[in-house]
């Protein structure tokens, strides 16, 4: 079992570096970053990867609220200086702060997410850029170094709660003087600078019948609020009493720079596996779809990164006809092409299979593709994500392809695929 410098276990490292003698651990669920088609462009390494599997710890690692008090010099208070004491400091003024101490909770496991590569962070998340991310660089990240923490009940794994902010290497969380905070009765709470937003789907994520819910903000203490006027506004939203911070299968978590999808262990049992998706590719290729111009057989590749191959399929985004690479009907000025099957003029893009199973809401043939990126998936999966608004900028929203984070185009954001072998 791999231990960190702060004494906690790393589930990712334990999973990859186990000696094979440990019993399989209970899987709580997965956190999957939107915008990656199964892995990071540079490859998944350690805690930096496209998805993070939450396993039950050998020993409980959770903490719960214990007591709070006011101090005059927060930086020199005992709780802050004690590296073994989890605490949150709410700065009220230069000379006054409320310290909330936390104690061990034997009923929960804690997992932390953020941009920092320090040991308390279980899942290192960097800013997601749309499209091809091979050479992309972010000049200034908007993701917090210690963005959020998730506490899972060890006896009731379906109860996974999310909280804004995570504990640093000294087991402290600091909310500065300018941070949004408030005190109700005896409890104090606050929001992080750019906030942690959550969106629970309405209905079951598996099955494809769920609808997009409303985005909410989660506080440091775990309460749920309506969104602020802008991402970092000082005034908090209204409390939402009929919603909670328990993650549901399909809950989205936005960290202002990256959006994560929570898939519960139960939900994943009803989702396709990578092997299932590869079999779907084989089934399409077995039909030997042809290009109507070159008359060559098209082959959907399994690999995500593909070059201009003679058998590579392309889709006309205005009509959905799938063909090979050719120069017929190309407009030299705009680059648009006229489809030889229906004479519709429009853009053409390479067709690529969506290979991240967690994004699928059902199991079936990949008969639709996102516009404009060309990632293929099932009809219900494509239509679900085309109706999900992802936070963008300070107060905007936009629908994106979950496999590459490219903003969707067109009236619907998707197109039904028409293969030559299915034509009469």
UniProtKB/Swiss-Prot annotation:
Gene Ontology CC terms, in alphabetical order: cytoplasmic side of plasma membrane; cytosol
Any one GO MF annotation of this record: ubiquitin-protein transferase activity
Disordered, as annotated region: 1-21
Classification via InterPro entries: Pellino_fam, Pellino_FHA, Pellino_RING
S-S bridge residues: none
Modification Phosphoserine, positions: 10
Keywords: Phosphoprotein
Membrane-spanning parts: none
Keyword Signal listed: no
GO biological processes: innate immune response; negative regulation of antifungal innate immune response; negative regulation of defense response to bacterium; negative regulation of Toll signaling pathway; positive regulation of antimicrobial peptide production; positive regulation of Toll signaling pathway; protein K48-linked ubiquitination; protein polyubiquitination
Family the entry assigns: Belongs to the pellino family.
Subunit structure: Interacts with pll.
Functional summary from the UniProt entry: Scaffold protein involved in the Toll signaling pathway via its interaction with pelle/pll kinase.
Name this polypeptide is given: Protein pellino
Annotated source species: Drosophila melanogaster
Source taxonomy: Eukaryota, Metazoa, Ecdysozoa, Arthropoda, Hexapoda
Gene field: Pli
């Amino acid at each position: 079992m791999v231990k960190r410098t702060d004494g906690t276990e790393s589930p990712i490292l334990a999973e990859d570096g186990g000696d094979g003698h440990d019993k399989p651990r209970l899987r709580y669920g997965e956190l999957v970053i939107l915008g990656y088609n199964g892995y990071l462009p540079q490859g998944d390494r350690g805690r930096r990867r496209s998805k993070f599997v939450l396993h039950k710890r050998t020993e409980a690692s959770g903490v719960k609220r214990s007591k709070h008090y006011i101090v005059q010099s927060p930086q020199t208070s005992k709780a802050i200086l004690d590296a073994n004491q989890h605490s949150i400091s709410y700065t009220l003024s230069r000379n006054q702060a409320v310290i909330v101490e936390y104690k061990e909770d034997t009923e929960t496991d804690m997992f932390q997410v953020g941009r920092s590569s320090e040991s308390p962070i279980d899942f290192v998340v960097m800013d997601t850029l749309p499209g091809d991310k091979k050479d992309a660089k972010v000049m200034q990240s908007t993701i917090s170094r210690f963005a959020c923490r998730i506490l899972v009940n060890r006896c009731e794994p379906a109860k996974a709660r999310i909280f804004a902010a995570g504990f640093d290497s000294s087991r402290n969380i600091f909310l500065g003087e300018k941070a949004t905070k408030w005190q109700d009765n005896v409890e104090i709470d606050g929001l992080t600078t750019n906030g942690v937003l959550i969106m629970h789907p309405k209905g079951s994520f598996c099955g494809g019948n769920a609808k997009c819910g409303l985005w909410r903000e989660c506080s440091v203490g775990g309460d749920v609020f309506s969104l602020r006027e802008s991402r970092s506004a000082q005034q908090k939203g209204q409390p939402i009493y009929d919603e909670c911070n328990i993650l549901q299968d399909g809950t989205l978590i936005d960290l202002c720079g990256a959006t994560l999808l929570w898939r519960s262990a139960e939900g994943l049992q009803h989702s396709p596996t990578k092997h299932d998706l590869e079999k779907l590719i084989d089934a399409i290729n077995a039909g030997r779809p042809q290009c109507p111009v070159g008359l060559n057989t098209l082959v959907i590749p399994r690999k995500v990164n593909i070059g201009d191959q003679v058998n590579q399929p392309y889709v006309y985004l205005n009509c959905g006809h799938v063909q090979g690479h050719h120069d017929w009907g190309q407009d030299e000025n705009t680059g648009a092409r006229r489809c030889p099957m229906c004479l519709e003029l429009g853009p053409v893009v390479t067709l690529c299979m969506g290979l991240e199973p967690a994004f699928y809401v059902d199991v079936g043939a990949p008969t639709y593709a996102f516009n404009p990126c060309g990632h293929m998936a099932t009809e219900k999966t494509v239509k679900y994500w085309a109706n999900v608004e992802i936070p963008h900028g300070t107060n905007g929203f936009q629908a994106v392809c979950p496999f590459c984070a490219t903003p969707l185009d067109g009236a619907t954001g998707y197109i039904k695929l028409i293969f030559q072998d299915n034509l009469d």
